[in-house]
Structures are given as structure tokens and as C-alpha cells.
């Protein structure tokens, strides 16, 4: 079976997540934001709730080398027509590619064929050649009463498929903005990024079913985003620690809110006050399967003395990694965020001359790095024996759309942000 995945705003990060989750299959990057997975395993619709980097996914049913509407129509009619209809059938068409495919003729002819079969229909259209996940969700195109037909141009062919599920944007927004305890001043990790980090730390996590026994630690738990997302992904043994009493209170409140909102049962979690640089005093050696965390990233407001901040954070992270190595199991992973300061934080070039820069790997291509700001002020903590893992499969590492740093990490952020996130995967 072949599945397609429409990737999020950071395709490299999204692809790395898919490679970790679906390590039993063969991944191909069809376009900058389209991945194709060939696998023997059936992928259920609810997987979309556990992979943060995918906007929509579906099953590829056929392929054709023809650009003619009639040839495409003949194929999509075999897998897109409903078996039984109770109300007016809704359908939409999304085309990912640069070829000239007449979507208007295709949509009108498909609507005509449905009517000839006694099926009244409504064609859902958009100004763009692709339908957003919001449009797909609002028009119920992933239900039995609808369909989003997806056409992907790749390798001189058109791959024809149907969307199975789209990212649950309402739920993600609810968890991000509806939580009872938020600390906007110290920063908030987006739930989608938390899911990606969890999957990078524990390969194939959503595919293993509920009730997994791995022990997950977040030693800078903040308001508990990583822990609550791990709960929703089926993990049952969670540990959170922080040096801030308020952070622990916020985490406890948010965990309780998630448990009540989603009616979760049998989740074991422990919260305790601890400095991350002394956490081995609280946990046994080799007792933790994965450490996933966004540590303190430095002050986010006011005039920043970047050189001083970098020095302080490097000391904090180096000492923390030394402790993590004591409590983490052999081959266990640490997935953490390191801050990357953009050049917009400083004035003249002379002000920035002493900042260590973070170079993006040249094989990422100009298209891959075009949206990146000028990055500088990156950290280089002592890894204390940990190894940085390249999360991209070897077969895709030279793809022109892959955007890694020179040290094989990924950078995440938006153009207006002064501090970006560097996602680092470490292995013991």
C-alpha cells in the first residue's frame, strides 16, 4: 500500500517524524511538502492525532502518466464514488504539482457521472489548487458522505488518492489556548511540536497501541505540554520536574484538565521539584527511556545580552546532559530544544562578530532555506558522551528539499521570531 502525507510548515521536521513513526516502510519525498510511504501496514485514521507534523494523509489508489481529464476521471471514479448515499455527496479535488491538469473539467465530469449513477453531489471548490484541512473538515470530506480526491505529480506520473484524515486543528487549538494554566512570558511549546519531539525520541510510538510502558521524563516541564501530549499519545509512565514551583502547579493543573477533558484513565505521573543539573539525586540510574524537553531558553523580552545568555545556557545544558546520561537507559534518546538567536536581535555587524553562527547544510538547497532568517548566536554545550542523531533516512539526506544544520539538527521558527528553536536528537 502507498500512502501520501502532506507535510507541515517545516517539511524536514515533518519528514523526520514520519521516518521515526513509520520506520517499517519506505519513505519518498515526492515534493517539498509531500511524502509517499510504501508499507504493508494499514494506517488508521486516528494516527493523525498523534503525528504533529502532518496536515493531511490518505491512501494512493492508482497512478497514470496521462494528463487528460477523461483518463484521470476513469481512475478516480473507481475509488471515490460512494457505495451508498443518504444525503448529497460532497467532493473536492486537490492537485499538488505544476502540470496543466484541467480541474474544472475534471470536477464537472465527475459530478455528471455521479448524477448518472443517481447520486446528487456538491463540488467543494477553492481559489487554490489544493483544499485546506479546514475546508476538508468543515465539508466532511473524510466521511462516508464525502471525498477529497488528491492528485500528486511525481516521477513523470500522477498519483491518485483519497484523503483519510486531516490534522485536528480544533483540538490542537483547544489544548494550546484553552488550558487553564499558561505562561506566555516564559514561552509556550506548541502541542504539534511536542508530538513531533515525542515521536523522534521514541520511534513508532503511535503505532504500538495504547498503554505503552516507557518512562518519559521532562526535566524542565514548564506548563506540562510534553507530558499532556504524551498522555494523549498513549504513554502511561510520565515524570515531570522543574525548579519553579509555579511551573509544577501549572503542570498539575493542565494534566488534571487533560485527564478530565479526554476522560483518560490509568495514567501514572510524578511531579517533583528539582534542578535539572541535580536530577540524578531524584531518579535511579538507567531508569528513564526518553528525555524530551524544552529547557529554559533565556530571557525572551527586553534588551538581550546574547553573549552572556549563550554562556549561561551552555553551562546549564552541559551540566544537565551530564545528569541525563546517568538516568537514561542505554541507547535512550534525549530530544531537546536549544535556542537560536537571529541577527535581528543585534545592531551592527561588529556587535555580532563574537556570536557563534549556526550554518545550514548546503545540500538543503536555496529553496529550502529561503524562508530562514540570518541565524547566529547558536549554542555549543558539552554533549558529555551523547551523539547527535541525524533524524532523516540516509536515502533522503541529499534531497534538495531537506534542510539540516551542519551538525545534523533541525531549525524551527517563524520569520518574525527573534529566537528560533533548534531541535536536537541525542542518543546515549
Language model: regions and residue ranges:
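Glycine-rich adenosyl-nucleotide cofactor-binding module
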Residues: 143, 154-204, 215-233
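Class I S-adenosyl-L-methionine
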Residues: 127-147, 174-176, 385-428
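Intrinsic-disorder-associated, low-complexity terminal segments enriched in Asp/Asn/His/Tyr and depleted
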Residues: 266, 351-354, 380-382
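Glycine-biased, low-complexity coil/linker segments
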Residues: 208-211, 346-347, 352-356, 360-363, ...
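Short strand-turn motif at the edge of the Rossmann-like AdoMet-binding core
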Residues: 3, 7-8, 337-340
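S-adenosylmethionine
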Residues: 271-342, 380-416
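Non-catalytic nucleic-acid substrate-recognition regions in nucleic-acid-modifying enzymes
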Residues: 6-7, 16-147
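Conserved S-adenosyl-L-methionine
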Residues: 190-203, 210, 214-262, 268-278, ...
